[in-house]
Amino acid sequence: MQRTAIGLALVWVALLAPVADAHHSYAMYDGSVYKVFTGVIVRIIPNAAHFEMHFVPLNEQRDALVRDDKGQPLVWVAQMESAAQALKDGVTRESFPQGTVFSMGIHPRRDGKPAGDRGMSGLFQCAKGTKPEPGKHCDSVAGNKAFGAGEIPKEGAA
């Protein structure tokens, strides 16, 4: 009887372990603030738990990539919900190939690392071969495409 109970407990733990491991707390992100970016896709990582968009922001004039202290492109990581939700919204490697210009807001990491969570922000892709006017985002470009619900949030407090 005791062996059966231990066996069942082990099976239960084994079944729940992937669920517990698949998600993490959002405490690392400042959900009270949005940073809004227009950037260029470097790569897409469709992780099952959290879809990631790696990108380099464009400067406010929209004519150059933002660079770090060493002159290298400053790559940010935008975490989204699951790959299944991203697919439902139409966000795939094929719909966002390397070099795609897009805009979205993210809740930045509290530790200052160049990463954040999309939250409820809209995601807009500029029409191929276009970019926004200085200080604007892809939602202002003729022929833009929206992915999922939401609008580009205002920079600052959410």
Descriptions of predicted regions:
Residues A27-A158:
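PEST-like low-complexity, intrinsically disordered acidic/proline/serine-rich tracts
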Residues I6-G7, A83:
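Short amphipathic alpha-helical "recognition" segments used for binding
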Residues P18-V19, S95:
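Generic detector of short, well-ordered, non-transmembrane alpha-helical segments enriched
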Residues G7-A17:
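Bacterial N-terminal signal peptides
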Residues M1-T4:
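Positively charged n-region of N-terminal signal peptides that target proteins for export
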Residues A20-A27:
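Boundary at the C-terminal end of the N-terminal hydrophobic targeting segment
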